[in-house]
Design a protein with these regions (language model features):
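Residues lining the SAM
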Residues: 11, 74, 269
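Conserved SAM-binding strand-loop segment of SAM-dependent methyltransferases
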Residues: 49-52
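Oxidoreductase cofactor-interface core, primarily capturing Rossmann-like NAD(P)-dependent enzymes
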Residues: 2-45, 56-69, 77-87, 91-100, ...
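Short hotspots in intrinsically disordered terminal tails
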Residues: 1-2, 280
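A hydrophobic C-terminal alpha-helical subdomain
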Residues: 226-283
C-alpha cells in the first residue's frame, strides 16, 4: 500500500498567487511540498520542501507528487503549448495517486472564450474532470493588482474594450480563498467558484482609480482591432501572445467578465477588496 503524506503540494510557489497561498498555509502549520523549476527561488517557509518538477515533465511531476493527497495547481506561464503542459501535469498527478486537485482556473473558462488564454483553462478543467481525481475549480477574474500595468508610458490604457465592464479581483483575495479550500478540501469537492472583485468597472473607471492611486493623469482610449494590433506590433511578441493580450479587452467588451459573485466572501469570510483599496499605498 502506498504511504500517504500529510503534505499539501503546490505549484507556482515562486509566483504571486502560489507564493501567497504557500505562506498562508505555512502559518497554519500545513507541511508543504513546493513543485518548482528552480529550487533556489522557492520561498523559505517552515515545513516546506521544494521539489523540481516542471509541468511538461510527467515523470518528474509523478515522482514529486508521490504520496500526496491534495495538490494546488496554479497554471503554467502563458505559452503556445500551455494546454498540453497542463494535461501532462494532470495525468501525472492522477498517476501519482493524488486524490484531490484544486485548480486555479479562469472566469468563464470555455473552449469558446473570447479571451484566448482562458481556452487553456477549459482544456485543463476537462482533463481534471476525466482524471478520476476529486476536484475544485477556482475561476478568478483579471487581477486587480495588474491594472497599473495596463498604463502606457504616456498615461493611457489602450485596448478594444469598448464600454465593457470587468470585476477585477485582488490577488490577496484569491490566495485567501484558495487557502480556505486547501485547509478543508473535502468540503469543496466538485465545486466551481468564481472569484471576482466587488464591482464591475469600465476601463474609464479603472483608469481613474489607477490615476488616483498613482498621482498621475491616466485615461482610457478605446481602440479598433487594427489599432490594437498596430499599437502592440513593436513588442516583437508572437502572434498567439498578441492575440491573447488584445482578447483581454475584447472579452470585456463582449460582457464575459462583468459578473460579480459573492464567492470570495463565502470562502474567506471577508468581502472582496475594491480596486481602490488594492492600489492604495501601504501604510
Amino acid at each position: 500500500m502506498r504511504r500517504r503524506s500529510l503534505e499539501t503540494a503546490l505549484t507556482g510557489a515562486t509566483g504571486r498567487i502560489g507564493g501567497r497561498v504557500a505562506a498562508r498555509l505555512a502559518t497554519k502549520g500545513v507541511p508543504l511540498r513546493l513543485l518548482v523549476r528552480d529550487p533556489d527561488r522557492a520561498p523559505d517557509l517552515p515545513g516546506a520542501t521544494p521539489v523540481v518538477a516542471p509541468f511538461a515533465d510527467g515523470d518528474a511531476v509523478r515522482a514529486a507528487l508521490a504520496g500526496v493527497e491534495t495538490a494546488f495547481m496554479v497554471s503554467a506561464s502563458e505559452a503556445a503549448d500551455r494546454a498540453q503542459q497542463h494535461v501532462t501535469f494532470v495525468e501525472a498527478a492522477a498517476a501519482a495517486g493524488v486524490r484531490h486537485l484544486v485548480y486555479l482556473s479562469f472566469q468563464g473558462a470555455s473552449r469558446e472564450s473570447t479571451f484566448t488564454f482562458a481556452r487553456d483553462h477549459a482544456v485543463t478543467e476537462e482533463a481534471i474532470r476525466a482524471s478520476g481525481m476529486a476536484w475544485t475549480f477556482l475561476r478568478d477574474s483579471f487581477y486587480a493588482d495588474f491594472m497599473p500595468g495596463l498604463v502606457g508610458d504616456d498615461g493611457i490604457i489602450r485596448g478594444p474594450g469598448g464600454d465593457g465592464r470587468v470585476a477585477v479581483v485582488a490577488q490577496d483575495d484569491i490566495a485567501d480563498a484558495a487557502a480556505a479550500v486547501l485547509l478543508d478540501p473535502a468540503a469543496h469537492a466538485g465545486r466551481t467558484y468564481t472569484l471576482t472583485g466587488p464591482a464591475a468597472l469600465s476601463f474609464n473607471e479603472i483608469a481613474a482609480i489607477v490615476g488616483e492611486a498613482s498621482g498621475r493623469d491616466v485615461c482610457y482610449v478605446d481602440e479598433t482591432l487594427d489599432e490594437a494590433r498596430a499599437s502592440r506590433a513593436g513588442y516583437g511578441a508572437p502572434d498567439w501572445e498578441v492575440a491573447g493580450w488584445i482578447s483581454t479587452y475584447t472579452a470585456v467588451a463582449a460582457g464575459e467578465h462583468a459578473e460579480v459573485t459573492g464567492d470570495v466572501e463565502a470562502l474567506t469570510g471577508h468581502p472582496a477588496t475594491p480596486l481602490r483599496e488594492v492600489l492604495a499605498p501601504a501604510g
